[in-house]
């Protein structure tokens, strides 16, 4: 009944991943991002992560597997997804939704910390404002974007971009794989000392 549709969806996902893998720069960017994050943790820093919708869920997933557990038992790493409902609703009401992430970064971000900003379009205004706030705090910035990188293109120390111009879910599928690889590499870097 739906077998062809299912095959088409899985083939498109595989094709998107294959296209991402063809660009060796993506592999190097993932490695640079993981080392940057581990270096921050080793120096006493933390990572703040943010995004909207599915990207917000990815930001939470990233922080959860750093503070909790990925594949192996190990000490937790300092990671915070900007997802506190009282903060988000307060700032949205009092300042506007475009400031929900930047106000948090201004409040708890410090030099030596890292911001992970996630946006499939690269055009999320509140993530862009968070990047600006992170820069003002002396933080490093990593972005996970899609398509042509949007307005976020060129704004990060490390940008990991999925150059897919179809539906956003294909970009998100690569983002979550990248997030898992980042965590795996961070764990390896942290063991190195």
From Swiss-Prot:
Protein localization: Cytoplasm
GO BP, sorted A to Z: carbohydrate metabolic process; D-glycero-D-manno-heptose 7-phosphate biosynthetic process
Pathways per UniProt: Carbohydrate biosynthesis; D-glycero-D-manno-heptose 7-phosphate biosynthesis; D-glycero-alpha-D-manno-heptose 7-phosphate and D-glycero-beta-D-manno-heptose 7-phosphate from sedoheptulose 7-phosphate: step 1/1
Reaction it catalyzes: 2 D-sedoheptulose 7-phosphate = D-glycero-alpha-D-manno-heptose 7-phosphate + D-glycero-beta-D-manno-heptose 7-phosphate
GO CC terms in record: cytoplasm
Pfam families per UniProt: SIS_2 (PF13580)
Keywords: Carbohydrate metabolism, Cytoplasm, Isomerase, Metal-binding, Zinc
Known role: Catalyzes the isomerization of sedoheptulose 7-phosphate in D-glycero-D-manno-heptose 7-phosphate.
Miscellaneous comment text of the record: The reaction produces a racemic mixture of D-glycero-alpha-D-manno-heptose 7-phosphate and D-glycero-beta-D-manno-heptose 7-phosphate.
Name assigned to this protein: Phosphoheptose isomerase
Source species: Klebsiella pneumoniae (strain 342)
């Amino acid at each position: 009944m739906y077998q062809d549709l299912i095959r088409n969806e899985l083939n498109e996902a595989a094709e998107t991943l294959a296209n991402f893998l063809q660009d060796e720069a993506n592999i190097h960017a993932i490695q640079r991002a993981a080392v940057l994050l581990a270096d921050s943790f080793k120096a006493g820093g933390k990572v703040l992560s943010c995004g909207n919708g599915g990207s917000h869920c990815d930001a939470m997933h990233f922080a959860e597997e750093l503070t909790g557990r990925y594949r192996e038992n190990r000490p937790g790493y300092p990671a915070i997804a900007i997802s506190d409902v009282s903060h988000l609703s307060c700032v949205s009401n009092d300042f506007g939704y475009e400031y929900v992430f930047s106000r948090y970064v201004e409040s708890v971000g410090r030099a030596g910390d890292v911001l992970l900003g996630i946006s499939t379009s690269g055009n999320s205004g509140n993530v862009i404002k968070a990047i600006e706030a992170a820069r003002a705090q002396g933080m490093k910035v990593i972005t996970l974007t899609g398509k042509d990188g949007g307005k976020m293109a060129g704004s990060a120390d490390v940008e990991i971009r999925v150059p897919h111009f179809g539906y956003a879910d294909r970009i998100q599928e690569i983002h979550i794989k990248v997030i898992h690889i980042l965590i795996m590499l961070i764990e390896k870097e942290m063991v190195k000392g």
